[in-house]
């Protein structure tokens, strides 16, 4: 694949669009989009493939803008009056027993010609007494493409659409037109909101930014990365895990692991919370859940991260459960099970994995626990993990030569990762607090940067440890360990 040719075609498409030659611009855009699509199929590196897909998406948006401009210009050439809303208030009262005046002959619709290959029903007008009638206007036959669609028709279309057809649309996008998620059957605002607020790219958190947790990293690589590298191996009984649940006390790195998955694995990352799938309208939340999973299958390979999943799918059958929340839970369970069933014999590189995190695993519904096949414990950092966390948090700060991070790691035993970060942050501010003590605001503003860049000492950590205590109790740790002994699946 000639990369220079791709760049040249993209440049020509943009130049023709700026000059107003939209037809030539659309031809170049279609060609470069097809070239990038073929190039992505030959790329094996997930990171490089993700960057090419992002470039392809940007060109696709430009192509859609040019296409909308062309359609707008074409609409000016059509001899058709604009459709204005009919105002019934200006119409005087009409007796229903009296027929309205006939439509002028020059405004009548042309007679429809019956063709032998298809049936066309003639346009019928109800001229009987029917209450108020709008002002007399030009009548047009309603073609098949202009037929108004009702909500019932949209629901039928959405219900009849299957995931395999959607996947073929994505893979077979050789014509350059079917390159974006088709939200037919759903509200356009819902689709745009999910694409704008949920799809996250490049959170800039890497595996090296997370200390310890080697078992969790290994499992996530096995569940997300390896199926993309070895698609022929992960088939049948070796199919990828469709659900992973991370359990542990607050501040141990569950959300950071999810961000690292989004950065390192090169998959589309959906970050879902309870507010994302909540709507005040009846039945809207269930549609959001279904739309989320359909978009995930379309943009596969995809990782759906549901943080604090106990707030969305808590135990069913309790006395304080609302009917609406029960319907949302049922739809979520159906879609999660459908993910595995739809992709069981498919290409593992087109997988959809649900990655969940919770601090209250004992409140999760039993059916959801079964669908989350891997349930791993994210514990408090070990002695080595605490030392690594100190090094990561203090890598941009100057340290005193006499300070020993191993000694500090022993003092912060029982602290979570978030607690250790707070200790490092507070200790790094101690020198600045001592320097500005007793100074006026003018004197503080006059201080140079070098005067504030003082090394962090062991005494600074001692003062910070006196102010900051651990946030996880021993009783909580016992509850997590007991639950993992009973339901863990690492």
From Swiss-Prot:
Residues 116-127, 143-169 have a biased composition (Basic and acidic residues). Residues 95-178 are annotated as: Disordered. SMART domains: AAA. GO terms for biological process: microtubule severing; spermatogenesis. Residues 128-139 have a biased composition (Low complexity). GO terms for molecular function: ATP binding; ATP hydrolysis activity; microtubule binding; microtubule severing ATPase activity. ATP binds at residues 248-255. It is found in: Cytoplasm, Cytoskeleton; Cytoplasm; Cytoplasm, Cytoskeleton, Spindle pole; Cytoplasm, Cytoskeleton, Spindle. The keyword Acetylation applies. Gene3D superfamilies: 1.10.8.60, P-loop containing nucleotide triphosphate hydrolases (3.40.50.300), Phosphotransferase system, lactose/cellobiose-type IIA subunit (1.20.58.80). GO terms for cellular component: centrosome; cytoplasm; microtubule; spindle; spindle pole. It catalyses: n ATP + n H2O + a microtubule = n ADP + n phosphate + (n+1) alpha/beta tubulin heterodimers. Pfam families: AAA (PF00004), AAA_lid_3 (PF17862), KATNA1_MIT (PF21126), Vps4_C (PF09336). Its EC number is 5.6.1.1. The modification Phosphoserine is found at residue 174. It comes from the Eukaryota. The keyword Transport does not apply. SUPFAM superfamilies: P-loop containing nucleoside triphosphate hydrolases. InterPro entries: AAA+_ATPase, AAA_lid_3, ATPase_AAA_core, ATPase_AAA_CS, KATNA1, KATNA1_MIT, Katnal1_chordates, KTNA1_AAA_dom. Keywords: Acetylation, ATP-binding, Cytoplasm, Cytoskeleton, Isomerase, Microtubule, Nucleotide-binding, Phosphoprotein. The modification N-acetylmethionine is found at residue 1. Belongs to the AAA ATPase family. Katanin p60 subunit A1 subfamily. A-like 1 sub-subfamily. Interacts with KATNB1 and KATNBL1. Regulates microtubule dynamics in Sertoli cells, a process that is essential for spermiogenesis and male fertility. Severs microtubules in an ATP-dependent manner, promoting rapid reorganization of cellular microtubule arrays. Has microtubule-severing activity in vitro. This is Katanin p60 ATPase-containing subunit A-like 1. It comes from Sorex araneus (Eurasian common shrew).
């Amino acid at each position: 694949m000639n990369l220079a040719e791709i760049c040249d075609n993209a440049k020509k498409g943009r130049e023709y669009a700026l000059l107003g030659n939209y037809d030539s611009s659309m031809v170049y855009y279609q060609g470069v989009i097809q070239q990038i699509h073929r190039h992505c199929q030959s790329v094996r590196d997930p990171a490089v493939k993700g960057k090419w897909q992002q470039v392809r998406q940007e060109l696709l948006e430009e192509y859609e803008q040019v296409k909308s401009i062309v359609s707008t210009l074409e609409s000016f050439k059509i001899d058709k009056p604009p459709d204005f809303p009919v105002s019934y208030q200006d119409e005087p009262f009409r007796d229903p027993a009296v027929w309205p005046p006939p439509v002028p002959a020059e405004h009548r619709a042309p007679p429809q010609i019956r063709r032998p290959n298809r049936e066309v029903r003639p346009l019928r007008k109800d001229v009987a007494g029917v209450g108020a009638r709008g002002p007399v206007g030009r009548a047009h036959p309603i073609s098949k493409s202009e037929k108004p669609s009702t909500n019932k028709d949209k629901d039928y279309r959405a219900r009849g659409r299957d995931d395999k057809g959607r996947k073929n649309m994505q893979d077979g996008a050789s014509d350059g037109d079917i390159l974006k998620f088709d939200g037919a059957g759903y509200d356009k605002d819902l689709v745009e909101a999910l694409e704008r607020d949920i799809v996250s790219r490049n959170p800039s958190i890497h595996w090296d930014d997370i200390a310890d947790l080697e078992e969790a990293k290994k499992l996530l690589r096995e569940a997300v990365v390896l199926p993309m590298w070895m698609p022929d191996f992960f088939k049948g009984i070796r199919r990828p895990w469709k659900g992973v649940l991370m359990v542990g006390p607050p501040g141990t790195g569950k959300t950071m692991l999810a961000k690292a998955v989004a950065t390192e694995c090169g998959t589309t990352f959906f970050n879902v919370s309870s507010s994302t799938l909540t709507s005040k309208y009846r039945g809207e939340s269930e549609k959001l859940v279904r739309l989320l999973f359909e978009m995930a299958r379309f943009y596969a390979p995809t990782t759906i991260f549901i943080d604090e999943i106990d707030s969305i799918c808590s135990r069913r059958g309790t006395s304080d459960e609302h009917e609406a929340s029960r319907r949302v839970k049922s739809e979520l369970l159906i879609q999660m099970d459908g993910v595995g069933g739809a992709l069981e014999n498919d290409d593992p590189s087109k997988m959809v994995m649900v990655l969940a995190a919770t601090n209250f695993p004992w409140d999760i519904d039993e059916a959801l626990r079964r669908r989350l096949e891997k349930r791993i414990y994210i514990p408090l950092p070990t002695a080595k993990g605490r030392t690594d966390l100190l090094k990561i948090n203090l890598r941009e700060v100057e340290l005193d030569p006499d300070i020993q991070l191993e000694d500090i790691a022993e003092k912060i035993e029982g602290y979570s990762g978030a607690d250790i970060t707070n200790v490092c942050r507070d200790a790094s501010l101690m020198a600045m607090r001592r320097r500005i003590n007793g100074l006026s605001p003018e004197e503080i503003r006059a201080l140079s940067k070098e005067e504030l860049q003082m090394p962090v000492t062991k005494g600074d950590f001692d003062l910070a440890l006196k102010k900051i205590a651990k946030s996880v109790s021993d009783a909580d740790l016992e509850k997590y360990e007991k639950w993992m002994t009973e339901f863990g699946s690492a």
